[in-house]
Amino acid sequence: MRVTEYIPGQPCWSELATHDWQGAKRFYHALFGWDMADMALPGSAFSMFTLDGDDLGAIYQVPDVAVDNLKTQWGIYFATDNVDTTIARVLEAGGTLVMGPHDIGHAGRMAQLADPEGARFAVWECKRHIGAKRRHEPGALCWVELASRSPARAHQFYCEVFGWDCRESSNSEMRYCEWLVSGEAHGGMLEMTAEWGEMPPHWMLYFQVLDCDEHAARVEALGGRVCVPPTDIPGVGRFAVLNDPDGGIFSVIALRGS
């Protein structure tokens, strides 16, 4: 559906940092049908990815000076009405400031942050650009999910920073929390067990599709990898965790009844 504004705390933008900008553009265009609008930015190659002319997110080339420090990865932005106030809340709650704050021309103001476990996220204060103009439809972001080793600590942190409510889900055998903004679920949180190995806490982005299995097969055909094969979530839909050719991890989900 089309979006004209975001409530503070809602996911509002997704962004891929990649070491293969051209390859990423080809891969995601073939996978989701996204069109790419290249933009000139000092020191980096940058593209907006769009659906029928509506901005959904961005893909950018990791600068050479950051090659050793930044892996190919998807990042999520949450809306805020004041970036600087949000930074202060993050620091007070035990998080860290990773980068910024920066004004992005007349579009808005942003900062990259990390929670107490190191899971990174960004915040966006809209001026002229609200963020993604579509959500909850095929090809668009529909869900974000925090994998945490300390759910109680994460719960306290994000509720203090964004004012989210948390609802325990009854649709899973494992403990699962749904994050609520003004009563609407926009994401979730699960606990990382020993089976996760040394993987650090992180945010996972889910893009909606009509056919999970078809997209998983397409990822492999395009040179990517299936990390978690298509799996049913009772009462919700069918999802898969995927890896693009440069190592960017993301998920797709075909929602029940969609």
Can you annotate each of these PLM segments?
Residues 1-22, 73-78, 124-155, 203-205, ...:
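N-terminal beta-strand motif that seeds the catalytic metal site of vicinal oxygen chelate
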Residues 30, 160-161, 185-191, 195, ...:
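Long compositionally biased, domain-poor regions of proteins
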